[in-house]
Amino acid sequence: MSKLYDSIEELIIELEDEDGDPVGGRTVAIIPGAFKPPHLGHLDMVRQYAEQADEVIVLISSPLRASRVILGQPISTRKSMEIWEMLLDDAGISDVKLEVSPKPSPVAATYDYIDENSPLEPGTKIILGASQKGGDFKRWRSAAKYVNPALELLPPEETAVIPANRPSGEPYSATDARKMLEQDENADEFFGEGRTETVRSILGLDSQIDEMSAMAGGAVQGYGAPLGTKKRKKKKQSEYNELY
């Protein structure tokens, strides 16, 4: 009888060891970006990576200056976070963690997250968010130099996803989303049906539009002599993947 008890005890110990040290570890997808603002194109990327990974981490970087504004209102990391929460809740997507990085660029934020001080458990497989469009995955060509040796980086060129397009067939663009919000147009195609006003409220645009309307009304009532306006030369912006 004692031999039977010994055998059972050994089996229990083996099972406990297996539970404590799972074979293969977890897979975590990291999707970095400034997200100014986040939109359904970003959400689709999260959805695709959620099918490949056990958990998706959306890493919001913190630019040194407010380079993206709408009607004078900067799109802060807090506002980006609120819009993300709305999008994820509407889509019913769980297993997504929203985190803010103090680093100014998405790439720097990612390297900081996966380095020797990474909060990820040893043995975790890492997917770095990237689009198949335009060789976007090449941004991670140096990632192997920064990743914690205890983590396993999956090849970005193999895990990159196909970017979604808007209903019109046009690619999603944060620039276009900002422009539509600035011009007080319906931007539901970027944020979901009936969500334009919610996004305006999060970004603090409602009060700005009301103030501009009041100022315009006052200008019409008062005397206004024609003023010559000098056109400002528009600065050319460097091209970058607006998916992020």
Task: Give the location of each predicted region.
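Nucleotidyltransferase catalytic core that binds NTPs
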Residues: 2-210, 214, 222-225, 242
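Short interaction-hotspot residues at assembly and binding interfaces
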Residues: 218-244
